[in-house]
Amino acid sequence: MYAHLALILGCWTVVLQGAETDVGERADNRRPIWNLAHMVNAVAQIPDFLDLGANALEADVTFKGSVPTYTYHGTPCDFGRDCIRWEYFNVFLKTLREYTTPGNAKYRDGFILFVLDLKTGSLSNDQVRPAGENVAKELLQNYWNNGNNGGRAYVVLSLPDIGHYEFVRGFKEVLKKEGHEDLLEKVGYDFSGPYLPSLPTLDATHEAYKKAGVDGHIWLSDGLTNFSPLGDMARLKEAIKSRDSANGFINKIYYWSVDKVSTTKAALDVGVDGIMTNYPNVLIGVLKESGYNDKYRLATYDDNPWETFKN
């Protein structure tokens, strides 16, 4: 009898502990943060930046005509970086797939998203849509493996010009025609410019998304090179206010290039969702500090990058 009672009590203990764990996880109201390693264009750099604590990577995609050919930034670039590291785009995507496919020897559970900084400024107007189609084909074949156990990371397509909305329309059309419209659930969008003569207003950016047929999965970036002064973050604060409004169209906002502890804290304090940095370990250190470890945490795969955080 005593043995039976002990067994019952033991089972209840396990159940209660499990319930407490579930409640604890649900009660974690800290803002998830995407730690985006900046300008990762050579495959040898991928594990290096992941080892520094990045849960996301950004690569620059350059075109020959409308064909995405290399991951390459070129000069000038952020201070302290090698501007000319590169890889063939298809090879880079295949390598990303290895790092984000469960069961692969290179798989990293914490690598959850990558941003493709699409250098479409070199394209003529009639090349923009074909370029979007070609990027979709490359991702489908070399990253998603034609829908057969491809990489699981989320993808953000970052375009430097709100006038290039036809890129997105072409991209989406290819996935639909190929029978892989479901993969659009893994894709987000970021219209980041143009920067000259001045950045577009949020209203103009919103209109561009409407023209692209995009309603949701929207990221917005703001910032400058790492050797520029921080400034007053006026546009960033305006974007965050819009994101958090009742009729906001932005889901996530990230700031770049943030390399110092002071600028990292300043960006977190105003409410960003992501930090793009040349030194991912800096953010990791800040997230451990008192005053930050109770408000922010590193995003995981279970965090939806297309969902606006509500606290």
From Swiss-Prot:
Domain of life, source organism: Eukaryota
Tissue spec: Expressed by the venom gland.
GO MF entries: lyase activity; metal ion binding; phosphoric diester hydrolase activity; toxin activity
Intracellular or extracellular location(s): Secreted
Catalysed conversion reaction: an N-(acyl)-sphingosylphosphocholine = an N-(acyl)-sphingosyl-1,3-cyclic phosphate + choline; an N-(acyl)-sphingosylphosphoethanolamine = an N-(acyl)-sphingosyl-1,3-cyclic phosphate + ethanolamine; a 1-acyl-sn-glycero-3-phosphocholine = a 1-acyl-sn-glycero-2,3-cyclic phosphate + choline; a 1-acyl-sn-glycero-3-phosphoethanolamine = a 1-acyl-sn-glycero-2,3-cyclic phosphate + ethanolamine
Keywords for this protein: Cytolysis, Dermonecrotic toxin, Disulfide bond, Hemolysis, Lipid degradation, Lipid metabolism, Lyase, Magnesium, Metal-binding, Secreted, Signal, Toxin, Zymogen
Enzyme class (EC, first level): lyase
GO biological process, one term: lipid catabolic process
Active site (UniProt): H38, H73 (nucleophile)
Binding site for Mg(2+): E58, D60, D117
CC cofactor note: Binds 1 Mg(2+) ion per subunit.
Cofactor: Mg(2+)
Protein family: Belongs to the arthropod phospholipase D family. Class I subfamily.
Function: Dermonecrotic toxins cleave the phosphodiester linkage between the phosphate and headgroup of certain phospholipids (sphingolipid and lysolipid substrates), forming an alcohol (often choline) and a cyclic phosphate. This toxin acts on sphingomyelin (SM) with high activity. It also act on acyl- and alkyl-lysophosphatidylcholine (LPC), but not on sphingosylphosphorylcholine (SPC) and phosphatidylcholine (PC). It may also act on ceramide phosphoethanolamine (CPE), and lysophosphatidylethanolamine (LPE), but not on lysophosphatidylserine (LPS), and lysophosphatidylglycerol (LPG).
Protein name from the UniProt record: Dermonecrotic toxin LlSicTox-alphaIII1i
